[in-house]
Amino acid sequence: MRFSIVVAAYNVERYIGECLESLKSQSFGDFECIVVNDCSQDGTLDAIDRAIAGDGRFTVLTLERNSGLSAARNAGMAAAAGEFIMFLDGDDYYAPEALERLDARITADNLDMLYFGAASFYESRKLRREHYENQEVRESVGGVHCGPDMYVLMERTKAFRPSACLYTVRKALLDTCGLRFLDGILHEDVLFQMQLIPHPQRVAFLNEPLYQRRMREGSIMTTRPTMRNVHGLAVTAQRMQEWLAAHAGEYSREFCEAYAWRTSDTREVAARYLREIDEADVAAYRKGLSVEELAAFDLHVLGLWRSMGHVYDEYETSHAYRIGHALIAIPQKIRKLVELPQAKPGE
């Protein structure tokens, strides 16, 4: 069997049918789909059963309690029997030729891992205005490279996207490395992908929008951040820092620079989220940390947030802000904090 597609589903009654129909209508049929129902509280399970009725390529696993995206994906991985594994969120779907295009490129280049593109669509104008992301505009990276070299090239061209849904990888490679998603955190994709990057030997990028990404109300991407978001990013950045410190001598200078930049950027995102969270929630979170965790959080996230706060405060009392030119007169030092800088490893 060529592909195992793990679909995590939690309270997606309105969307899961379209998701699974996109698999049933694929032009390439050598796949299995493992749908993991994460103890949904709506009609998701009934919608799954209706969508897959009579199709033996689909299997349903139901978790006994709501355990989160990491646990759902890990359960699907454990049951997967395909040569390559993919992850599809239950409110998204694939283009009709997605698996065929992936199989052709994997076969042509004998790949271990293949990145591919996405297109975002929005359920409302408000969502498009507030959460716009230009997934389609990504510079192509040609050729076949080892994992670390491909990562450097993708960071350099801004083509890198830390999402488990935007690549397919050999299942045997994941099993050999013992890679699984870290339970109990949000933004688990980032850590999993950064742990995976060093291992594949033959990697390519198919810059086609094969993944259709839905932006909707109530998803992780569109809801106001909480300390769970901050925690997930902080844990991810800390694990990345520890890994880089232990293994930097094994990789090129360019790779280490790119990896360090992504680690720093992950912390910056966590710090920016703090600006939207009530101080009482931050205090309650800090109270629950161990001494070691508190030190790391205060040094790397809270301290960065305070530094960023001074810049924001200076900006908001500036003349340009008061007269309403916020969009055209942002000081350069704020841009450096708010925008994601371009990685330039090796330059």
Task: Specify the residue positions occupied by each region the protein language model found.
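Cell-envelope/extracellular polymer assembly enzymes that use nucleotide-activated donors
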Residues: 1-4, 32, 191
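Acidic helix N-cap motif at the loop->helix transition within catalytic regions
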Residues: 17, 31, 42-51, 57, ...
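A conserved acidic beta->alpha catalytic loop
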Residues: 22, 37-46, 65, 89
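Short, well-formed alpha-helical segments that are part of the catalytic scaffolds
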Residues: 12-25
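Donor-binding/catalytic cores of nucleotide-activated saccharide
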Residues: 90-204, 213-230, 249
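Short aromatic/hydrophobic "clamp" motif used to bind/position activated sugar donors
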Residues: 85
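Catalytic core of nucleotide-sugar-dependent glycosyltransferases
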Residues: 208-217, 223-251, 265-294
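Membrane-interface aromatic/basic loop that binds lipid-linked glycans or pyrophosphate carriers
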Residues: 111, 271-347
